[in-house]
């Protein structure tokens, strides 16, 4: 009679193998993100149409975008993609402590981005740039606002995942959830790079 004795190393290997195989959750997430991509494509189209129909300066006075704020805030959001991916690598190894550490850092960086965007909104509104004041104000707040809501959605997902992995035993299902959240976060970051380049650099 033989007895199979599992080792932590073999368990982790099996876990990683199962995570690397396609599953319905990951495929469904990718399909959903494709629809989100179409949504943001519509927002980009709206922005360019408004700009093409505008007369005079773009953005119009008194709007002055704070590039000195937008650059570091954007850099932090881009860097958060790397910390998020480090969390994914930890999840694939079965390292729940590493996952929590990297996802907590990502959560803080994403929060910094949202606060930075809110700070810019406050100053633009104080200067007279409002959503109803001009076509520029409308497309600026709508495009960046919807993106900001998506970022907040990602932050909620990070909080949920951190709480879930803290209150219960770490499982392959939780690792898959961490990977799915990373797909969403990378998507949000890529969209912002496009928005940032369009709004702040394309004249």
What is the role of each PLM region?
Residues 1-203:
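...captures the hydrophobic TM-helix bundle architecture rather than a specific catalytic motif
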């Amino acid at each position: 009679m033989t007895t199979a004795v599992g080792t932590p190393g073999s368990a982790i290997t099996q876990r990683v193998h199962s995570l690397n195989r396609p599953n319905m959750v990951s495929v469904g997430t990718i399909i959903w993100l494709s629809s989100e991509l179409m949504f943001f494509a519509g927002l980009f189209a709206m922005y360019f149409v408004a700009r093409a129909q505008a007369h005079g300066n773009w953005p119009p006075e008194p709007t002055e975008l704070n590039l000195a704020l937008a650059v570091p805030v954007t850099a932090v959001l881009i860097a958060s993609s790397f910390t998020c991916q480090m969390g994914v690598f930890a999840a694939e190894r079965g390292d729940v402590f590493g996952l929590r550490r990297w996802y907590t850092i990502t959560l803080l960086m994403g929060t910094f981005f949202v606060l930075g965007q809110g700070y810019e909104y406050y100053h633009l509104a104080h200067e007279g740039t409002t959503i109803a004041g001009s076509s520029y104000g409308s497309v600026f707040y709508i495009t960046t606002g919807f993106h900001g809501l998506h970022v907040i959605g990602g932050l909620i997902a990070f909080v949920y995942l951190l709480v879930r992995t803290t209150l219960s035993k770490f499982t392959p299902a939780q690792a898959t959830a961490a990977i799915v959240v990373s797909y969403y976060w990378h998507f949000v970051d890529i969209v912002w790079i496009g928005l940032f380049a369009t709004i702040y650099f394309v004249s």
